[in-house]
Amino acid sequence: YPFVKCTLSSSSCECPAPETFLLQDPNYFGFRDPWPFLTSPDRLYLKYGPLKLLENIQCIISGLIKYDRSSGDVERNVSWTNIGEQPSRESINVDLEGTKKSKSEVTATTTRFGSHDFNTVYSDPRCLVLRISQTEKKVPFRSCLLWVKEPFLKNPLRHCRFLFDVFCNWNRVDLKPAKDCDKGVEKKDERPTRAGNQNSGTNRPPR
């Protein structure tokens, strides 16, 4: 194989990590286009994610808000359940954009959390594996997200899990998503409290 390096003076050979070989293989590029998945009207459920980022969170779901075919703009909603004595539901809107550098790269922007970059390591009509950019210093190396479409939640998707193991950090959490796991969970009350209203007036500039 051309990617295996051996020398006559040594009885050993050097093999690159499988992920490195696959990501550079032109035959694999066709499996790294995330946009058919991200523009799908199906609800998407997060199955795997970095343990560090998903503490006390479950049932992460993304729904399509808008897909403009002419401009390529994609907007989705992402909601999740905060685990506690009284579970509550939060949500944010996310703008998704591609980059000129590569079709596999995705930038996600929110007003609450700013912008974050991802690189697609695998995508098909059933699942999507996104690796969080290595420029994100707060997440472990090779951290990934595995998203699954709602119709395939009960499918083992062994190939998706296998590729996640090949490309991604094994220190992950399995959210074990179930269809409609968001039903019956109250939305987080974001209304300001009476104390908050009183405090907010103390910093007003004089008129």
Feature names for model-found ranges:
Residues 1-207:
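A beta-rich soluble binding module of mature secreted/lumenal proteins
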